[in-house]
C-alpha cells in the first residue's frame, strides 16, 4: 500500500447546515480528496430534486478539487440514478436485525440485497454494508458471512474501526475477513464508559466516540493490516465524536495521527525507518 494510492474522504454529517461551497472549502482545506455525503433529509442535497440537486452539489465540489466518494443513504431508484449520473460509486447502508429476531435476519437481509442487485447492475453503483453495534449486523465476521454469496461489484463491505472495536474484534482478523469485498475503510474510535448504576447496584454503560488514540480500536494494527494487504481504496474519516466541541481540530488531529501510523507501517514493510524518526 502507498498513501498516494488512497482516496481520502471525510463524512460530512456533522455539518448539515453549511452551504455546499463552504463545506467544499472546509473539506479541501483539511487535505481531503473527497467526501462521504449523507444523502438524507435535512442535508445540502435536496432529495426531492434528484438528480439535479446532486449534480449541482457535485459540480461545486469538483471545482474545489473534491468528489463524492460515497453516500450514506437509502438505496432507492432515485438515489441509484443520481449516484450514477455524477459518478458516485458506493451507497453505504447498515443491516438491521429483523423485527422477528436475529434468526430471521439472515434470510430477510438476503432477500433485500437480492432485490438491490438489479439496480446495482443497471446503474453501475455498489451497495456497501457497514457493521454497527446494537440492533444491526454488529461486526465484520457477521458481515463476511453474508457477503460471501454476493458479487463485490454489486454488494460490498464498509469496514468500521469503531464498531468492530466495540464488538471486540481486532483489525488483524476483521479486515482480511472482508478483503474480497472491501470498498471503504472507516476510521473512528470508541469505548465504553460508565453512565451510572441501576437501582440494584449494577453498572450502566454508554458508548463514547473518542479520539483515534483513545478508543478500543487499534489503529496501528489496522494500519499494518492495510499496508500488508496493499489496500488501495477509499479511507474515510468519519468525524464522529460524542463531544463535538472543536470538531474540526479533532478531525484534523485524527487524520494526522492515522497518516503517521500508515507512514510507520509503510516504513516497517519496506524495512526502513519512518521519516519522522529519521529526522528526529
Which residues does each predicted region cover?
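Charged helix-capping and loop-helix junction motifs
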Residues: 49-56, 105-114, 140-145, 169-176, ...
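N-terminal pre-domain/capping segments
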Residues: 1-90, 180, 255-280
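Hydrophobic faces of well-ordered beta-strands that scaffold small-molecule active sites
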Residues: 6-12, 35-37, 68-73, 91-93, ...
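C-terminal/domain-terminus segments
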Residues: 237-258
Amino acid at each position: 500500500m502507498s498513501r498516494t494510492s488512497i482516496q481520502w474522504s471525510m463524512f460530512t454529517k456533522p455539518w448539515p447546515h453549511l452551504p455546499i461551497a463552504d463545506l467544499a472549502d472546509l473539506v479541501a482545506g483539511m487535505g481531503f480528496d473527497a467526501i462521504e455525503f449523507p444523502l438524507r433529509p435535512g442535508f445540502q442535497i435536496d432529495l426531492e430534486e434528484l438528480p439535479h440537486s446532486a449534480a449541482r452539489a457535485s459540480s461545486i465540489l469538483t471545482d474545489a478539487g473534491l468528489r463524492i466518494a460515497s453516500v450514506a443513504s437509502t438505496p432507492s431508484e432515485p438515489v441509484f440514478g443520481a449516484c450514477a449520473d455524477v459518478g458516485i460509486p458506493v451507497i453505504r447502508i447498515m443491516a438491521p436485525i429483523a423485527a422477528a429476531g436475529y434468526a430471521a435476519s439472515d434470510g430477510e437481509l438476503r432477500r433485500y440485497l437480492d432485490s438491490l442487485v438489479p439496480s446495482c447492475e443497471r446503474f453501475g453503483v455498489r451497495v456497501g454494508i457497514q457493521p454497527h453495534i446494537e440492533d444491526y449486523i454488529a461486526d465484520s465476521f457477521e458481515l463476511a458471512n453474508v457477503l460471501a454469496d454476493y458479487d463485490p461489484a454489486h454488494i460490498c463491505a464498509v469496514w468500521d474501526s469503531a464498531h468492530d472495536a466495540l464488538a471486540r474484534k481486532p483489525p488483524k482478523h476483521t479486515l482480511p475477513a472482508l478483503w474480497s469485498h472491501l470498498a471503504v475503510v472507516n476510521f473512528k474510535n470508541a469505548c465504553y464508559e460508565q453512565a451510572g448504576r441501576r437501582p440494584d447496584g449494577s453498572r450502566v454503560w454508554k458508548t463514547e466516540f473518542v479520539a483515534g488514540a483513545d478508543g478500543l480500536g487499534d489503529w496501528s494494527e489496522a494500519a499494518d493490516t492495510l499496508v500488508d494487504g496493499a489496500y488501495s481504496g477509499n479511507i474515510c474519516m468519519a468525524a464522529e465524536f460524542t463531544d463535538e466541541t472543536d470538531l474540526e481540530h479533532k478531525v484534523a488531529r485524527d487524520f494526522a495521527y492515522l497518516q503517521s501510523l500508515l507512514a510507520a507501517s509503510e516504513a516497517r514493510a519496506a524495512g526502513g525507518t519512518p521519516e519522522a524518526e529519521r529526522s528526529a
